[in-house]
């Protein structure tokens, strides 16, 4: 009996030692922590070599919307514009930029055996067909404007806009600098030359002194198509035909 008790006590003692050794070798379980995914870095653009379309040259076809049937035009009416602009890329998205500048815009409309009395002492502008009497072989109306264009631009590759598609919408506000008619080569009703000379008459009396023109450009690199439509009338209300000039053409940009 004593032997049984001694054997049992020995077994319990050994088990106790083994349990203590096992507990001391166990490592605490650390709670798993899921690391947050790193935030995607915003792409940085290098604009140090970016051309900003500071200088714009435009040539285009000019016309009059709402032109009366009694006004006969001919030839290739045209516009010439030149602007210097400052370009400011958006820090939040360099694809976009805003541009503002100044320049000069000119329109030249050619007429077929017509007379515009812009200098006549009349209450309204005289516009008449002179094909059945003496007239000028070549006759045109030219206007020149000092303008301030503003554009919102988008470039598909802001680091290399000279090799990228681009879009621009904007508006330009202009003040009239000069308006004149120019006639060349005086003829009779049979279109026979009577005398070769040039007559130029200048007056701004019948013209609106301010014009507002929404604009649009789209193209690639340094060449873009442009369109412009004057929402203000060319002549003062009630003093001349209710025409609104428009232009479609090409823009060459640089710097």
Question: Which residues are covered by each model-predicted region?
Answer:
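Bacterial Sec-dependent N-terminal signal peptides
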Residues: 1-26, 252-255
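Sec-dependent signal peptide cleavage junction
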Residues: 17-54
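Short loop/turn motifs that connect adjacent beta-strands in outer-membrane beta-barrel proteins
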Residues: 40-53, 89-96, 157-165, 180
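Residues on the lipid-exposed face of transmembrane beta-strands in outer-membrane beta-barrel proteins
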Residues: 57, 82-88, 102-104, 146-154, ...
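Surface-exposed strand-loop-strand hairpins of Gram-negative outer-membrane beta-barrel proteins
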Residues: 62-83, 202, 235
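Extracellular/periplasm-exposed beta-strand and loop segments of Gram-negative cell-envelope proteins
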Residues: 68-75, 110-120, 125-143, 176-188, ...
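Predominantly the C-terminal beta-signal and adjacent terminal strand-loop region
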Residues: 198-255
């Amino acid at each position: 009996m004593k032997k049984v008790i001694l054997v049992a006590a020995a077994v319990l003692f050994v088990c106790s030692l083994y349990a203590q050794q096992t507990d001391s070798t166990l490592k605490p379980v650390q709670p798993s922590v899921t690391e947050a995914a790193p935030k995607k870095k915003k792409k940085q653009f290098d604009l140090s070599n970016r051309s900003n379309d500071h200088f714009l040259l435009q040539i285009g076809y000019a016309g009059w919307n709402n032109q009366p049937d009694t006004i006969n035009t001919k030839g290739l009416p045209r516009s010439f514009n030149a602007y210097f602009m400052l370009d400011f890329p958006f820090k939040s998205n360099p694809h976009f930029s805003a541009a503002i500048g100044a320049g000069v815009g000119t329109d030249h409309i050619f007429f077929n055996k017509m007379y515009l009395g812009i200098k006549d002492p009349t209450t309204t502008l005289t516009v008449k067909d002179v094909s059945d009497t003496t007239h000028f072989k070549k006759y045109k109306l030219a206007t020149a404007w000092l303008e301030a264009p503003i554009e919102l631009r988008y470039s598909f590759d802001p680091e290399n806009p000279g090799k990228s598609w681009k879009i621009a919408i904007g508006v330009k506000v202009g003040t009239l600098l000069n308006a004149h008619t120019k006639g060349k080569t005086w003829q009779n009703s049979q279109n026979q030359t009577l005398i070769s000379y040039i007559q130029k008459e200048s007056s701004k009396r019948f013209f609106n002194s301010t014009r507002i023109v929404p604009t649009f450009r789209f193209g690639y690199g340094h060449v873009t198509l442009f369109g412009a439509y004057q929402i203000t009338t060319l002549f003062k209300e009630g003093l001349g035909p209710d025409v609104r000039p428009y232009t479609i053409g090409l823009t060459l940009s640089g710097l």
